[in-house]
């Protein structure tokens, strides 16, 4: 088993979980800051937004997780802030981040559609890297299986949990996000192939579809009244993305995404 603590200096412990999230964030900000000027948004606007959105998204992700695991946390109130042990829900972070983005664009008089198109590929990369934090913490895994011989030994060892090998759902989602990133980066380079806003819509449909399937393999899903919350949210994202594309294609005067 991999030690979840990457570095310890006296009482200060730096967890791999945090390093994975921060690594994803740094790469995402870099990519977004390079793309933003092409859409008339300064790199400084990206940095300013991240300084506001990232901490709020972490809080939102934690609140989302705690709400649906309240039966546990009501008895362990001291653990509510212990995010270094894992337990932040991506959908909580995405919802919070989207709300902050809309508020930021309104305040700075920026086009939110352009901002969302810039953010979507970067978010995919951040999620792909961040999922490895779940791997280190041995969370977000799937059902028990007899073997994982198709995977490298270090993954097999880390996925041996509670006496059984587990489906590495973290890996599936990480690769799914990475594949989505590659597709959209290639697609958006083709002239007049995507309308403004459709990169964001692609993200909603792509991530929602992958998460809908992968969530069904997991054994630690957040539940509400016996329902896997993330599957319903995923289905909602797909519907929103499809409706957005259909309406966008029917509208006249919508400009094409241009690099």
UniProtKB/Swiss-Prot annotation:
Entries under PROSITE patterns matching the protein: LGT
Primary localization: membrane
Amino-acid positions noted as binding a 1,2-diacyl-sn-glycero-3-phospho-(1'-sn-glycerol) in the UniProt annotation, renumbered to this chain: 131
Pfam families xrefs: LGT
GO biological process, alphabetically ordered: lipoprotein biosynthetic process
Localization: Cell membrane
UniProt xrefs under InterPro entries: Lgt
Gene Ontology molecular-function annotations: phosphatidylglycerol-prolipoprotein diacylglyceryl transferase activity
Enzyme Commission no: 2.5.1.145
GO cellular component terms given for this protein: plasma membrane
Membrane topology term: Multi-pass membrane protein
Keyword rRNA-binding: no
Disulfide bridge partners, by residue number: none
Keyword Hydrolase: no
Keywords from the UniProt entry: Cell membrane, Membrane, Transferase, Transmembrane, Transmembrane helix
Pathway assignment: Protein modification; lipoprotein biosynthesis (diacylglyceryl transfer)
Parts of the chain that traverse the membrane: 12-32, 41-61, 80-100, 109-129, 167-187, 194-214, 226-246
Role, per record: Catalyzes the transfer of the diacylglyceryl group from phosphatidylglycerol to the sulfhydryl group of the N-terminal cysteine of a prolipoprotein, the first step in the formation of mature lipoproteins.
PANTHER family: PHOSPHATIDYLGLYCEROL--PROLIPOPROTEIN DIACYLGLYCERYL TRANSFERASE, PROLIPOPROTEIN DIACYLGLYCERYL TRANSFERASE
Similarity comment: Belongs to the Lgt family.
Protein name in UniProt: Phosphatidylglycerol--prolipoprotein diacylglyceryl transferase
Organism name: Streptococcus pyogenes serotype M1
